[in-house]
Amino acid sequence: MFKPNALFLTDGYKIGHKAMLAPGTTKLYGTWIPRSVKYAPKNIIKIVSFGQQMTWRWLHDEFEENFFKQPREVATQFGNDMSAYLGLQYDASHFEALHNLGYLPLKVKSLPEGIETAPNIPHMTFINTVDGFAWLTLYLETIVSSLAWKPSTSATLALQYRRRADLWVKNTDPSSMWLVPFMCHDFSARGLNPHDMISSGLGHATSFRGSDSIITIPAARYYYGETDVCINSVNASEHSVSTTKIFTVGEQQMLSDWMKTFPTGILSVVSDTFDLWQLITQYLPALKDEIMARDGKLVIRPDSGDPVDIICGIDDYIQNDDGTLYSVRYTSGMFRDRNKKITVSEQKGVIELLWDIFGGTTNEQGYKVLDPHIGAIYGDSITIDRQVEIYERLAAKGFAATNIVLGVGSYTYQYNTRDTFGFAAKGAWF
């Protein structure tokens, strides 16, 4: 297994910085700061402080295993490699001195994790505690930066989803606020590298319990001392297993079989392997008695198309005298022409169709809530803006926000950089 000397976890230009320090420099004070929301999603003005404990625990472990526990020759060999790298003789005595010391002589301070700050407020500081190691403080800038920006960024984005879910559930189904921690489910693992699976998964878990990033469970235990399982999920199908059943017993029988395999609890079924609308309008009515008799909820999961229209239906349409429906295309806010022919199912959308079949209740706020034996989740192309649009469109049709669970994927948690919130580790005092 590739386990390089931990000294390699830096930028090449750091190698010469010890010799560039002013003579007599004994201490160097570093800061970790989100400096800007210029490139952040709109309306985000604060950043969540998160990930510092994980960052320094990981860094400690890395240096312990791949530097301090190794023979002293690893420091000498690193110096030889740097001589070849720079094309001149390199003095590695300070790395040898660090190895002799046996630990990273740093004092780290951090804001409490989970609080929000405006930009330009340091989330953590670090300073060398032993004279002669001022060079070490920002030698670690590279690895601290690469470790720390992702968990804070993901926690900040997760909080935006949480606040919007809180608001819409409070307005449309306040007696079900307990559902909010499960209304945005982490689907992002497959779009992230293994370390980001951990850091981003933990970031999501600061606001939600719903997650398929199961690496979050041991990571929370190790880095944060979480004794309980901090996330939850359900039995759920994917297209591959659906296809094996559809081609052998048919889709309707597939649903019936799976409800027998999983007779209790929530069962999520990917529903557009072939035809979403056929599954909803033909197979679900045929299986209604089984679904309603089951001790749990069957969750329908569309997996393609415009999530807003699939969930909520198409609200911009016209109907010909013969009953044919067409979606409407607009240009610059003005009606232009018919766009394409649509079905009644497409016009209604998943939630209304499920209501037509299974019904439910109307709560005190006047919003419809699906029968607890049926539900829906959508986990493709979800963004913060689409989350709000889905809640708005459902409310306009008289449905509570609690009728839908959203899968938040790698677009949300991967489509970011260190510059999203302007994170930087910099020296501030010597």
Residue ranges with predicted function:
Residues I314-I318, R393, D419-K426:
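Short, surface-exposed amphipathic charged segments that create phosphate/polyanion-binding patches used
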Residues M1-A40, Y90, E96-P105, G114-E364, ...:
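Buried, small/hydrophobic-residue-enriched core segments of structured protein domains
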Residues G360-T361, Y367-A376, N403:
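Short beta-strand/loop segments at the ligand-binding rim of alpha/beta enzyme cores
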Residues L111, A376-I384, V408-T412:
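Glycine-rich beta-to-alpha transition loops that act as phosphate-gripper elements at the mouths
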Residues Y29-Y90:
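Low-complexity, highly charged intrinsically disordered N-terminal segments
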Residues K397-A424:
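Glycine-rich phosphate-binding active-site loops on the catalytic face of alpha/beta enzymes
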Residues V299-R301, G375, N403-G407:
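Beta-strand segments within the central parallel beta-sheet cores of soluble alpha/beta enzyme folds
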